[in-house]
């Protein structure tokens, strides 16, 4: 799979502080030993929010890369099943049709802005160039690495950073 970039994301959340750490790593096909980590922290109100932020940061990063090639494919490994299904099963279409309310008309209460941002970014990638892959939390080696960095960043006074 030449011209494929593999991305793994994870978020970590501290209930007491209402903060999250996020991390994503990436590497090019065939260059698994050349990992790049991108991480940061921000305020959050729930664990799912930290996972959403990690994926959004990754998508924003690759959408904004200068000189991005049209024929590049992206595979994103995520461990959050709800987010995986929301995109791959196209659950978001129902929310778009219903004005981001549930089918019974009740408003979606949590993280609506983040869910919408995720969908907007997902749609910015040409069809067939972005694939989500469900990975097992803390069992996939790249997920373990992003989890460790996301948890580590919560306890440090570091700014968002790219580490190669």
Which positions does each model-derived feature cover?
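RNase H catalytic domain
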Residues: 14-16, 56-147
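Short, conserved alpha-helix that lines the donor NDP-sugar binding/gating region
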Residues: 51, 55
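RNase H-like nuclease fold core
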Residues: 1-49, 60-63, 148-164
């Amino acid at each position: 799979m030449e011209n494929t970039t593999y991305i793994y994301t994870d978020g970590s959340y501290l209930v007491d502080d209402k903060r999250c750490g996020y991390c994503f790593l990436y590497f090019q096909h065939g260059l698994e030993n050349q990992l790049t980590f991108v991480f940061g922290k921000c305020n959050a109100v729930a664990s799912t929010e930290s996972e959403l932020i990690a994926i959004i940061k990754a998508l924003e990063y690759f959408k904004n890369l200068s000189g991005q090639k049209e024929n590049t494919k992206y595979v994103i490994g995520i461990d959050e099943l709800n987010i995986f299904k929301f995109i791959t099963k196209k659950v978001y279409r129902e929310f778009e049709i219903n004005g981001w309310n549930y089918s019974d008309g009740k408003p979606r209460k949590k993280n609506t802005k983040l869910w919408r941002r995720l969908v907007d970014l997902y749609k910015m990638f040409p069809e067939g160039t972005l694939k989500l892959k469900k990975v097992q939390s803390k069992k996939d080696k790249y997920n373990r690495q992003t989890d460790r960095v996301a948890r580590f960043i919560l306890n440090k006074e570091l700014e968002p950073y790219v580490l190669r």
